[in-house]
């Protein structure tokens, strides 16, 4: 039995809404010609990262503090990053569905909604609160930590932290269950095309979507499995990181269920997953973070994993991994993010029908086909780019 629902991120205080204007700039990918520079969602993997998820406190002052951070973020990055430019310090900002209503007004990105909860048997992809995501990364952890400290000092009275994870590179980009992570990531222009919104949503072209989940692993149980069984669950060899041949790879393998096709071609996303852990507590985890130009492919990958394709043929990794969080964010282009710093005059009508109205920020119900599945199986002919 599949139960799919959405939960609100947090209660909203009233904030002045604003209007936005996207300014064109040259030199961007074909699908993003209408906007200026995207945030660094397609940047290469780094050796250190901090993931901060927070909710905005009620009230206009809290919104104002968050907007001020948006306008000053580039300066903060320069102030911290100058110590080692080669470390490539960056910070991607994502905005949750309900926070968008508070910060940006009625115009919404087409794919922005509350992350849909997925439950099937004992497997549960939870939906958890989150108004703002900060994905801070660099080749040096000290730079990440310094930037996070400056940001949280600025926002101390305006936000409440929901989750903070410190990620690190583990050997040759392996996760804590011993397999290389991110092998199939696109690079260069292919990464940009996979992550940056184009003409399908022209008002928000240059933006992106990101889904984050914090997984904890039963490492003892996993390590008790023979290596060959682990490889069949993942779909790749453990030592050499070679994909198993289709003749021997189960249809429930992780990399089989997370392969999504559209019109005969694989739909790609960019994963920037990082291991994390606390040895004394026995916490060993993977922070999943996936960027895409539409949230639909990632949501369907997760449905394949938790429900199965077909239903019941689920990802056996979930017998050893538990999702502790799950949140969807929109990642504005750089000029759109900076423009959010200046609220427009509040529209009384918008305030009456805004975030505090019944159903605001809720995801639409997921239509279930008559066979009981979510229609995920083969996605050929299904448009992923909204």
Positions of PLM-derived features:
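Long, histidine/aromatic-enriched segments associated with O2/redox biology
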Residues: 15-376, 381-385
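Short, positively charged and aromatic/hydrophobic N-terminal segments
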Residues: 3-14
């Amino acid at each position: 039995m599949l139960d799919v629902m959405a939960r609100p991120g947090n209660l909203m205080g009233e904030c002045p809404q604003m209007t936005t204007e996207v300014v064109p700039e040259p030199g961007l990918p074909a699908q993003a010609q209408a906007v200026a520079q995207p945030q660094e969602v397609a940047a290469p993997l780094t050796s250190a990262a901090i993931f901060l998820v927070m909710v905005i406190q009620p009230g206009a002052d809290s919104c104002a503090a968050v907007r001020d951070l948006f306008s000053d973020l580039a300066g903060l990055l320069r102030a911290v990053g100058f110590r080692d430019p080669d470390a490539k310090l960056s910070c991607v900002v994502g905005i949750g569905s309900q926070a968008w209503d508070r910060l940006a007004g009625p115009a919404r990105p087409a794919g922005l909604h509350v992350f849909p909860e997925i439950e099937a048997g004992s497997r549960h992809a939870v939906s958890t609160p989150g108004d703002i995501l900060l994905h801070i990364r660099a080749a040096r952890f000290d730079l990440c930590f310094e930037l996070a400290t400056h940001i949280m000092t600025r926002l101390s009275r305006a936000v409440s932290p929901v989750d903070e994870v410190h990620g690190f590179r583990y050997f040759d980009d392996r996760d804590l269950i011993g397999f290389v992570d991110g092998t199939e990531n696109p690079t260069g222009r292919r990464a940009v095309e996979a992550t940056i919104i184009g003409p399908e949503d022209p008002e928000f072209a240059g933006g992106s979507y990101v889904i984050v989940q914090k997984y904890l692993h039963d490492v003892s149980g996993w390590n008790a499995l023979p290596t060959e069984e682990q490889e069949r669950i993942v779909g790749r060899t453990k030592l050499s990181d070679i994909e198993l041949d289709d003749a021997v790879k189960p249809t429930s393998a992780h990399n089989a269920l997370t392969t999504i096709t559209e019109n005969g071609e694989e739909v790609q996303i960019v994963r920037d997953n990082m291991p994390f852990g606390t040895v004394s507590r026995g916490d060993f985890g993977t922070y999943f973070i996936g960027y895409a130009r539409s949230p639909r492919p990632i949501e369907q990958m997760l449905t394949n994993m938790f429900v199965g394709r077909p239903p019941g043929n689920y990802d056996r990794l979930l017998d050893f991994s538990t999702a502790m969080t799950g949140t969807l964010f929109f990642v504005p282009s750089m000029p759109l993010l900076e423009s959010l710093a200046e609220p427009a005059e509040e529209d009384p009508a918008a305030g009456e029908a805004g975030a505090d109205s019944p159903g605001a920020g809720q995801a639409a119900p997921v239509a279930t086909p008559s066979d009981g599945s979510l229609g995920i199986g083969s996605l050929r002919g299904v448009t992923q780019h909204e």
